[in-house]
């Protein structure tokens, strides 16, 4: 998966998925998610795959209001809010520990790293 931060007709962002070919078949690149609504997803850039198969995406929009989120995207392509920043900063560097129990994410300012523990199998999409 990779993000096109300001891609799509509405310029709110897209996520593409690369499916490597097997047995000599060609690789396949497809559009996995495209936002048409800034309230649902806006300027996602850093992303990682959660232990559940969902994506965790860090938003990086530049506005005068505090409005960056960590967005989850289900395997079916539904976006949801996981967290919202309460300070004017962006989330970055999202990744999970090797055992999948701890999610690490950075805040650009004030500079800090958060370590968030699961249980990740109980994340609800609402």
Task: Describe these PLM feature segments.
Residues 1-126:
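Sequence/structural signature of beta-propeller domains
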């Amino acid at each position: 998966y990779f993000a096109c931060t300001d891609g799509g007709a509405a310029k709110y962002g897209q996520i593409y998925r690369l499916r490597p070919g097997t047995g000599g078949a060609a690789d396949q690149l497809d559009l996995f998610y495209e936002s048409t609504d800034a309230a649902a997803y806006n300027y996602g850039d850093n992303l990682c795959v959660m232990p559940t198969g969902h994506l965790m995406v860090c938003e990086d929009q530049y506005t005068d209001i505090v409005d960056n989120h960590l967005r989850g995207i289900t395997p079916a392509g539904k976006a949801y809010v996981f967290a919202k920043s309460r300070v004017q900063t962006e989330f970055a560097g999202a990744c999970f520990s090797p055992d999948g129990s701890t999610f690490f994410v950075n805040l650009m300012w004030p500079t800090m790293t958060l370590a968030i523990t699961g249980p990740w199998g109980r994340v609800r999409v609402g």
